[in-house]
Design a protein with these regions (language model features):
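Non-catalytic structural scaffold of enzyme domains
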Residues: 1-371
Length: 371
């Protein structure tokens, strides 16, 4: 059974006339009237402000009707004709223009017929990515920057939608795993549900260690996560095949959690981690007083990280190094680098995730026919 929504505004009599015409043609239809208050601009408001007020009043009314379950929505007032395309762009529910191409208002009978025969198939929804941000703040900005740079767009409008649920107060993931500190599960879950409620299509997390908790919340979230470790390991396999000898530089929490190690083992790729001395230097590069989380990207933190990289290459013959904490790419760049006299590829999981997100978004846009 079709449900038609009508925005009443200041035109109650017209709305009732249209409703009566609809029911006279098809009594099985449900007609919802939105009689929410319309904000009135000040008497001395500019024409631009008055028109913006009309747009926003109608936008809010359409949103209420869509939430109430309307399949198609019409207007008792003819003014939405002036900004009809702009209004329709913001919704997947079908709207019906109250006027003909010339701008003349349709009669109640003609408009009722237009509403009754309107296609109720929702318009395709633009792809939207949700990011749980604040893990940490600089890594969040870094991932977003890499997504923007990886997107082959020539105009602002060719980029896809992305929402960041920024919550730097999410408890420290490494402390939880290593010291029994506050658990971030509920904070991350709350962020994920907010992104789901905001109509996102997928969720990304700009923190390697946080992925240890993603598996705990994933079953309770209705949209998929794009897993940073998975896409990183897939890129390594595609690039190096069975020639890859991988070294992992990450937080001790990530190392012990097996986020990368388990995937490497399942894919048949050897992976090594630093010894205790060099793992301590990796942690210092991240958490130390002159580390990345303190805002440093050169000097002592670079020396610490380079020392761990050299250990992995010299001791285990690694030819691929994973920057397995999202702060580490702030210190070392992705790409080929000579370490201990050997050419080694440094892969940034943040960049790998950005590339995959762009690919998924482009494929969705092509399938849906809308950005």
């Amino acid at each position: 059974m079709k449900t038609i929504g009508l925005v009443v505004g200041h035109h109650c009599d017209t709305a009732l006339e249209i409703k009566a015409a609809i029911l006279a043609k098809d009594a099985s239809v449900t007609v919802l009237l939105d009689e929410g208050d319309f904000v009135e601009p000040a008497a001395d408001a500019t024409d631009a402000l008055k028109e913006a007020t009309r747009k926003i009043n109608n936008f809010n009314a359409v949103k209420r009707l869509q939430k109430a379950g309307a399949d198609v929505i019409g207007f008792a007032c003819g003014c939405p004709h002036r900004f009809f395309a702009e209004l329709q762009t913001e919704f997947t529910v079908r709207l019906v223009d109250p006027a003909c191409d010339s701008g003349e208002r349709l009669s109640a009978a003609d408009y009722a017929q237009a509403l009754l025969t309107a296609d109720v198939t929702p318009l395709p929804k633009p792809f939207k990515v949700g990011m749980i941000g604040g893990l940490g703040p600089a890594a969040t900005v870094d991932l977003y920057d890499k997504i923007v740079k990886a997107t082959p767009a020539k105009t602002d409008q060719e980029h896809f939608k992305l929402v960041v649920e920024q919550n730097p107060q999410i408890p420290d993931r490494t402390k939880c795993l290593l010291e029994g500190g506050d658990n971030p599960t509920l904070s991350m879950y709350n962020c994920a549900k907010r992104l789901e409620e905001d109509d996102c299509d997928c969720i990304i997390v700009p923190c390697n260690t946080a992925h240890a908790f993603v598996a705990l919340i994933e079953p309770f979230v209705g949209i998929p996560f794009i897993n940073m470790q998975q896409v990183t390991m897939q890129e390594i396999q595609e690039k190096f095949g069975d020639k890859a000898v991988i070294g992992l530089m990450a937080t001790t929490g990530t190392v012990r959690s097996g986020l990368y190690g388990q995937k490497a083992e399942a894919m048949g790729m050897p992976m090594y981690v630093p010894d205790d001395e060099h793992q301590a230097r990796v942690m210092a590069a991240i958490y130390g007083p002159q580390g990345a989380k303190a805002g440093f990207t050169d000097g002592v933190c670079r020396e610490d990280l380079s020392s761990a990289a050299e250990y992995l290459v010299k001791t285990h013959g690694c030819n691929v190094l994973i920057l397995g904490c999202t702060e580490l790419p702030l210190i070392l760049d992705e790409g080929f680098m000579t370490i201990a006299g050997k050419e080694v590829f440094i892969i940034d999981p943040t960049s790998a995730l950005a590339r995959r997100v762009v690919k998924v978004a482009q494929e969705a846009a092509a399938e849906r026919g809308v950005l």
